[in-house]
Amino acid sequence: MKVALISYEVYPFAKVGGLADVVGALPKYLEKASVKPIVIMPKHKVVEKNARNLDKVMEKISIPYLKTDETFDIYKTIVPKTNVPIYFVANEYYFSAENVYEGPDLAEQAIYFSAAVLETLKVLDLQMDVLHVNDWQTSLIPVYLKTLYKEDEFYAKTVTLLTIHNLGYQGIFDSKYMEFSGLPNYLYNIDGIEFYGKINFLKGGILYSDIINTVSPTYANEIQTKEYGEKLDGVLRLRSADLYGVLNGIDYDEYNPETDKRIFVNYSLDNIDKKYENKVRLQKELGLPEDRRIPMIGMITRLVDQKGLDILSEVLRYIVNYDIQFVILGTGDEKYEEMFKKAQQEFPKNVSANVKFDINLAQKIYAASDMFLMPSRYEPCGLGQMYSLRYGTIPIVRYTGGLADTVLEYDENKMTGNGFGFVEYDSSKLLKAVARALDFYKNKKVHWKKLIDNAMKTDLSWERSAKEYVKLYNKAMSKRI
């Protein structure tokens, strides 16, 4: 089975969010599952810094049906720690911005890349069984396949899988881009890619992909409701028979407390005491009182409403008054950046506000914290809770999306479960969940030890996820005419 994974960002070549981690790790595990994957992404400016042994394999390729004279080149290297080839679509006009999701025209850029992918596969004679596209930026690929490439023998047996990593980002643009895309005008209607007088790239992907998945089973159900559907719930219900949820995994080689070079002290379940050495070392680094007994709550997040910061803001003072240390890392809305900075000024012994992105500090927080807070309004999958479980740091979450699929409320009688949480999006419920976790930490040591044991034994591997994706590829291939 030959699969092309197509994405705007792929770790370690270009990373903005969790999508890069997913598409960076999945090929390695698909390879182990006897799939023959390749990866295709744009050659962003940052790729030059992060890619080794980049070879130009073809140049000056044109796209006949696009309203542009721009041509593209193709570069190639290998995804690290694999035998998987990765191809880069290079065009100075569209992909020379400093950051991944920037450019002169984001709609044109996505259209150009989608069309260039299909031409790349043809000129290199890379015939694929499945094109696995990700998010709105690549959602027009299935649309092109079912329209302009419908009679193309090269793609006669090629099927598509669309993965929606976050329904909140849809690629909604002015209808003028229909002309640039070269797509037939009949697509511009309510049953096509038209969306409230504009065009919606993700809607096109949902309607024209053979199979669709989101990054957790719960989120796949949630987005078919009005509350979470972002005005696409009707379209998603229309495709519900072809809509699945597959939890992301995490790379166990990359995120391993026994070998992670980014943390202070390596540890495992066999010497869990060393976890507390990480706490004391982090306390020292951040200027907090050095005491392994003080419960430390970590939070690594974008500082935006979606992550539950509106309800956290209502009870942050109460949480800090529980005599804990609260370590936050992230950037985002100015009001939340200021909130945490002020909290640190007011409670310097209890709050460490790190308003930045620092991957090494992130790992130290995962390893050093006792608890990890994720009170998200919605969370398609969430990786933070997975990393925290892997490092024996107990998650406190709102049960939504992937958080509901990975964190199981601890049952004191059965000694099952790996965390704590709440359902109703309400600050008092958040406070109650934090209080429950702190009670177990301070007063129920046997249960806390069991919680850490359960957390670190939770299967969050990519092996599990890769097997699920192979099932979806087979479902898509069964739709071949």
Curated annotation (Swiss-Prot):
Top-tier EC class: transferase
EC number: 2.4.1.21
Involved pathway(s): Glycan biosynthesis; glycogen biosynthesis
GO biological process: glycogen biosynthetic process
Reactions catalysed according to its record: [(1->4)-alpha-D-glucosyl](n) + ADP-alpha-D-glucose = [(1->4)-alpha-D-glucosyl](n+1) + ADP + H(+)
GO molecular function: alpha-1,4-glucan glucosyltransferase (ADP-glucose donor) activity; alpha-1,4-glucan glucosyltransferase (UDP-glucose donor) activity
Residues noted as binding ADP-alpha-D-glucose in the record, renumbered to the chain: 15
Alphabetized InterPro entries for the sequence: Glyco_trans_1, GS/SS, Starch_synth_cat_dom
Keyword set, alphabetical order: Glycogen biosynthesis, Glycosyltransferase, Transferase
Function description: Synthesizes alpha-1,4-glucan chains using ADP-glucose.
Family the entry assigns: Belongs to the glycosyltransferase 1 family. Bacterial/plant glycogen synthase subfamily.
Protein name: Glycogen synthase
Species this chain originates from: Thermosipho melanesiensis (strain DSM 12029 / CIP 104789 / BI429)
